[in-house]
A protein has these predicted regions:
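Membrane-interface segments at or immediately adjacent to transmembrane helices
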Residues: 327-382, 389-391, 395-400, 405, ...
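Hydrophobic alpha-helical membrane segments
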Residues: 1-338
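Loop/turn elements at helix/coil->beta-strand transitions in domains of secreted/extracellular proteins
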Residues: 222-223, 364, 432-436, 465-467, ...
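Conserved, mostly hydrophobic/aromatic
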Residues: 341, 360, 371, 406, ...
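Hydrophobic faces of well-ordered beta-strands that scaffold small-molecule active sites
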Residues: 338-341, 368-370, 437-441, 468-471, ...
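Active-site-proximal loop/turn and secondary-structure-junction residues that shape catalytic pockets
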Residues: 344, 374, 387, 443-445, ...
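Metal-dependent phosphodiesterase/phospholipase catalytic core, i.e.
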Residues: 384-487, 580-586
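C-terminal active-site rim and adjoining tail of enzyme catalytic domains
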Residues: 492-587
Length: 587
């Protein structure tokens, strides 16, 4: 049998159903954002407190599991519940789209009742096989779904950018492998896509659904591949075509007065958000229509249906306008501290060396972030890596060599050569240059038991007098710094955003790509600060600014300094609107 092409879907068809789909999106958003997320966070925090720990990180998770097995089991159950919430969200949106394709005249209330009733029935029929397949499809095979539809908990499952950057820098073949794998997964997603509709709408088992999809796409793989790809491309083209006149009008208005430019900016922000949801609607209905072979029709409407549609859209526009005012009017409420990562900027030298510090200090960063480790003889050396082979060619840990042996070693990076620097020399040079440091204490199992006690006794007074700050991945370091002098700022580094920590640290140094508004909102209820790393692009800068980061650790000081100046002194609303619109393309 000849396969069917996707049904046509016009703007008028979307418009006459916009109240329903907008209401569905907003209801889902409100339930997740204002009901489940706060509840989940409170429960997770309560359970974590029962373990006696103040935070959850890679270096204490094993201790939590072994020390509090029942609480750990409860936390695991909470993870499962979160996955079920994501599963329900997927089902709700797809079932909502399917009900729009039903050729029945329904009010908004009738539509909502039927969608939720069927969604709860869908949850009652959940099996491990179904949830595994649907998550695998949405997360791995066709991740466009989870990104476009903003499935919160699935979007939280990400590889932090610092790991991605490291792998790309060290292993260039990975990029080729990932590209090949992505193409392979897309092909598999085409072969399996009709299994999705069978599981969501037809109550089939995974085995039956997969068999059905493989049979349906057999001998027609290229046809379905092209049409699935075309649905995605048309969704983005649809959004871009609506976006162009908005940005063009804003660019013209930006040359006039601030007030006129801001007013149009807010209006355009509202339009962008509405067009964003219209594009989401287009993708969702088009995709479900392609899976089911059903077509969205324009059914006769009562006059009050128009009022209902405009009422829903009006409420959405008010919400978007408030969001737009905050976004456009105060892009940088407080200037963030700009911090050089490992004492270099734009590869201007070898990391953590006195020579690079002298160069970097000329760029006037607020702080220079450095890495310090203990040596075999109980001294302190400037070194980031646990094994120094990559920088020095010597296969050893800093704790295996004395300070004298380490400082004799040549160190090479970015085409520059130097000697390994001692912390004493580095600190003295920083004080001489009046350059403040953010000193990261890196710990290892080879450290002496009294390492931090000796470090603070030797350097604590000097650090405080010169305004230096400290940070560490090891919370024992935080405790000992605060015990020595609570007025020395010390930040706790968290490489992944999970359960909100309740520590005594001055603040947190977070990997930016996993950071979200929920973490920041909780932080605002404390007097703690937020540093983010590593900010090397305009995208990461924008995210950090709008989350209200107090400090940004970067490998490119001049770029971030320029971004801060523009954001504070001459924010172009056209640029801000463009960046907001680009979130639709953020993968």
């Amino acid at each position: 049998m000849k396969p069917e092409k996707p049904k046509n879907l016009g703007f008028k068809q979307i418009y006459f159903n916009l109240d329903k789909i907008l209401f569905l999106f907003f209801l889902t958003f409100m339930m997740i954002e204002f009901v489940w997320l706060p509840s989940n966070s409170w429960i997770a925090g309560l359970l974590l407190r029962q373990t006696g720990y103040l935070f959850l990180s890679y270096n204490n998770i094993f201790a939590i599991i072994t020390g509090s097995p029942f609480i750990s089991l409860a936390l695991f159950v909470l993870v499962i519940v979160n996955l079920l919430v994501a599963y329900f969200q997927i089902g709700l949106l797809f079932i909502g789209a399917r009900h729009l394709l039903c050729h029945e005249k329904r009010t908004l209330l009738e539509y909502s009742r039927k969608v939720f009733r069927q969604s709860f029935l869908f949850m009652k029929q959940v099996t491990l096989a179904k949830i595994t397949f649907i998550f695998f499809y949405v997360m791995m095979l066709f991740p466009v779904i989870r990104k476009i539809l903003k499935i919160y908990y699935l979007n939280k499952i990400v590889i932090p950018d610092f790991i991605v950057d490291y792998v790309e820098d060290k292993y260039w073949l990975v990029g080729i492998v990932v590209t090949i794998l992505a193409l392979l997964l897309f092909y598999i997603s085409v072969r399996f896509m009709f299994a999705l509709s069978q599981l969501l709408f037809e109550k089939k088992t995974v085995k039956e659904a997969v068999r059905y999809s493989l049979e349906k796409t057999r001998k027609h793989s290229w046809f379905y591949t092209w049409n699935l790809l075309w649905i995605v491309v048309k969704t983005y083209l649809f959004f871009i075509l609506l976006l162009i006149p908005i940005l063009a009008s804003q660019a013209l208005m930006d040359g006039l007065t601030h007030k006129e430019s801001l007013v149009l900016g807010i209006i355009n922000f509202v339009l962008i958000k509405n067009f964003h949801y219209i594009a989401l609607t287009y993708f969702l209905i088009k995709f479900v229509s392609f899976l089911t072979g059903e077509e969205l029709e324009i059914t006769p409407r009562r006059k009050k249906d128009h009022w209902m549609r405009w009422g829903v859209m009006g409420c959405a526009c008010i919400f978007f306008a408030l969001e737009g005012y905050v976004y456009l009017e105060a892009p940088v409420a407080n200037k963030p501290l700009i911090i050089s990562h490992r004492g270099v900027s734009n590869k201007n030298g070898v990391q953590n060396t006195v020579q690079s510090l002298e160069k970097t200090a000329q760029l006037s960063p607020d702080f220079v972030e450095t890495d310090v480790q203990e040596t075999k003889d109980g001294q302190f050396v400037m070194m980031h890596d646990a094994n120094i082979k990559n920088l020095t060619g010597v296969n050893a840990n800093p704790q295996d060599l004395t300070l004298k042996e380490l400082t004799k070693l040549d160190i090479s990076e970015n085409g520059y050569h130097s000697k390994v620097s001692s912390f004493d020399d580095y600190l003295n040079k920083a004080n001489e240059l009046h350059q403040k440091l953010l000193i990261e204490i890196k710990t290892s199992r080879k450290d002496s038991p009294d390492m931090m006690k000796r470090f603070m006794e030797k350097y604590g007074t000097v650090l405080k007098q010169n305004g230096h700050q400290m940070q560490s991945l090891d919370y024992h370091v935080i405790d000992q710094v605060l015990a020595y002098d609570s007025q020395i700022p010390v930040y706790f580094i968290l490489p992944y955003n999970s359960i909100f920590p309740r520590t005594k640290a001055t603040g947190y140094t977070m990997e930016y790509s996993t950071l979200d508004e929920n973490f920041v909102n909780k932080l605002w209820n404390t007097d703690q600060k937020l540093y983010v790393w590593t900010i090397n692009s305009s995208e990461s800068f924008d995210k950090s600014v709008h989350l209200g980061a107090d400090g940004m650790i970067t490998d490119d000081l001049e770029m971030i300094q320029e971004q801060v100046t523009i954001a504070q002194e001459d924010p172009e609303y056209t640029d801000l609107l463009f960046k907001q619109a680009m979130e639709f393309f953020n993968f």
